[in-house]
Structure formats: structure tokens, C-alpha cells
């Protein structure tokens, strides 16, 4: 049975669910999931799990993400991106690059962000975007996010300077809305702003260099096998033959070297445990003087792409 991660370069106009559907056909299995949605207008890294690798997706969802984006200053839209109707315009002609960089700096670090009202967040059991489309004025609560990096690469005047297109790179915590960053940057500068382009270049340890288009994957289904995926994602622990046997039966073993320290493996941040042959045996959490399995992966002879 084929199991592993597929790093897809999602095309513009496709929903994440569309990509999952296509992968189900390519992989010949219904058991395919993704590690965090990407808006239809966005392109770039979408991490999919096939069969047993779907169990790794929980640990990928919460990792940091990196994006390249273009923010247009001078116009606000109902969706905070280029797909929505323009609801206000204010000339950005007087906005300097220095002012932009200062506003960007204020949006870097740990901030409170109000998600875009046109989002998949549920409000009383209904998606926020559905409420907005029905004419409701939706107000979402602010939530803490971390902007690790917010770099300005270029500022390009358009329409005789009435709008400014700002090319940026953003590295951020899971749950950050880049559309909301564009909106908030525009509000801070008094011009309004929205997102016109978005490309995700990294999810956790998985990068655009590893990603393949759907066309490429239709020709050759490149799968990052389980042990490689887990080695890149979390701390590693090498097991002896006896330890691997004990863990494969769900039994506990001696705790890892980091037990009792802030680096100790936990259920939320486990260590990947490998047999002497390099195969992924389990995910482990330290508990006192012992390590216990959080997830156990049955041994298999699967080969990626076979």
C-alpha cells in the first residue's frame, strides 16, 4: 500500500479540496488529506498525505508557513484580496517607502490579528464567508499570531501612483491570514489595502523545491516516504532492535536523552522513532523515565511510487 507525503505546487483557481480529489485518483485511494488549506487564488506548497501518512498531517498543520505576496495599497475589497469587489479607494501617491517599512515593522512579531471576514472560520456553526455572502456584517474576534519575518522587496507605483504594489515575503505562524495582513497594512497607512498575489513557498520543513505540479505528478507520482517525511518534521530517535520490537507492540521504553528538559518529546510535539534499518516505527512522547508511543506505524515493505 502506497503511503507518504506528496508536496504539490497548487495551481491558481483550484481549491485544496480539488487537489485532494485529483490526488485520490492519481494514488488510487480515498485516504488522502491535506495539511492546511490554500485559498483558490493562491499557488504553491500544499502538503498532502496518502494512506498511513495522513496520520502525520496533524503535526504539519501547526508548523510555520512562508509566502511571497503582492499587496496593493490604495484599494480595499470585501474579501481583502483581488477576487472581491472594491469597496473603497484612497490614493497612495503620498505614501513613502519609509512609511510602508515602518508600518510593516509594526505588524511583525507577536500580534493580535482579526481574520478576514470572508474566511472558513465558523461563527455559530456556519462558515464566516457564507454569512458575509448572505449579507451579514460578520465581526470575528482577534487571535494571537506570530509574524516571524515580513520583508519588503519592492514598491511599484501603478495608475500614476494612485495605487502602490508592494512585493513582500512573510514567514508566520499557523493560522495567520496574509489577506488580513494586507488589509491591516492598508489601514495603518490610511489607504486601504488588499492582496493581489499569493504563493506559499514553505510549510514546516517542506519547500517549493520539493513541490511538483499536478501535471508532473500525473506523469510520475513522486512520494516522500514516511521515514523521510518524519525525519524532516520532528526530532529523531534511533532505536535498538529490542526497543523497536517493544514499541511496535505499543509498550513503553526508556525515555529519550531530552527527558525532563524543555526539549522533551510530548504528545503534541513527539519524536520520530526509527528502527535500525531506518524505517519509521512510531512517534514517541516522554513521560517521566519512560517514552511511550503516541502513534505506532505497522512495519511494511512499501516503496514510494510502487
Swiss-Prot record:
Its EC number is 5.4.99.25. It catalyses: uridine(55) in tRNA = pseudouridine(55) in tRNA. GO terms for biological process: mRNA pseudouridine synthesis; tRNA pseudouridine synthesis. Gene3D superfamilies: Pseudouridine synthase, PUA domain. It comes from the Bacteria. Pfam families: TruB_C, TruB_C_2, TruB_N. One of its GO terms (molecular function) is tRNA pseudouridine(55) synthase activity. Disulfide bonds: none annotated. The keyword Isomerase applies. The active site is at 39 (nucleophile). CDD domains: PseudoU_synth_EcTruB. Keywords: Isomerase, tRNA processing. It is an enzyme of class 5 (isomerase). NCBIfam families: TruB. Belongs to the pseudouridine synthase TruB family. Type 1 subfamily. Responsible for synthesis of pseudouridine from uracil-55 in the psi GC loop of transfer RNAs. This is tRNA pseudouridine synthase B. It comes from Arthrobacter sp. (strain FB24). The lineage of its organism: Bacteria, Bacillati, Actinomycetota, Actinomycetes, Micrococcales. The gene is truB.
Amino acid at each position: 500500500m502506497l503511503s507518504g507525503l506528496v508536496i504539490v505546487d497548487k495551481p491558481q483557481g483550484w481549491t485544496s479540496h480539488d487537489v485532494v480529489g485529483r490526488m485520490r485518483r492519481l494514488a488510487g485511494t480515498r485516504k488522502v488529506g491535506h495539511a492546511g488549506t490554500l485559498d483558490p487564488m493562491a499557488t504553491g506548497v500544499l502538503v498532502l498525505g496518502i494512506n498511513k501518512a495522513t496520520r502525520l498531517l496533524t503535526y504539519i498543520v501547526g508548523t510555520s508557513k512562508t509566502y511571497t505576496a503582492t499587496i496593493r495599497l490604495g484599494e480595499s475589497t470585501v474579501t481583502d484580496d483581488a477576487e472581491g469587489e472594491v469597496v473603497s479607494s484612497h490614493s497612495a501617491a503620498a505614501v513613502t517607502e519609509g512609511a510602508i517599512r515602518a508600518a510593516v515593522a509594526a505588524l511583525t512579531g507577536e500580534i493580535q490579528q482579526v481574520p478576514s471576514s470572508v474566511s472558513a472560520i465558523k461563527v455559530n456553526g456556519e462558515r464566516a464567508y457564507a454569512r458575509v455572502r448572505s449579507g451579514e456584517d460578520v465581526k470575528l474576534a482577534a487571535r494571537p499570531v506570530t509574524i516571524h519575518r515580513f520583508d519588503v522587496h519592492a514598491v511599484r507605483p501603478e495608475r500614476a501612483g494612485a495605487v502602490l504594489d508592494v512585493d513582500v515575503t512573510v514567514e508566520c505562524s499557523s493560522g495567520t491570514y496574509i489577506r488580513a495582513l494586507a488589509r491591516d497594512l492598508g489601514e495603518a497607512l490610511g489607504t486601504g489595502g488588499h492582496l493581489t498575489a499569493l504563493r506559499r513557498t514553505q510549510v514546516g520543513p517542506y519547500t517549493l523545491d520539493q513541490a511538483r505540479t499536478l501535471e508532473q505528478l500525473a506523469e510520475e507520482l513522486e512520494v516522500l516516504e514516511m521515514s523521510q517525511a518524519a525525519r524532516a518534521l520532528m526530532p529523531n530517535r534511533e532505536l535498538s532492535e529490542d526497543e523497536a520490537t517493544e514499541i511496535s507492540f505499543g509498550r513503553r521504553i526508556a525515555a529519550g536523552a531530552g527527558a525532563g528538559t524543555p526539549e522533551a518529546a510530548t504528545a503534541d510535539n513527539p519524536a520520530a522513532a526509527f528502527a535500525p534499518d531506518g524505517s519509521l516505527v512510531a512517534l514517541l512522547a516522554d513521560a517521566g523515565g519512560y517514552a511511550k508511543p503516541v502513534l505506532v506505524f505497522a512495519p511494511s515493505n512499501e516503496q514510494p511510487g510502487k
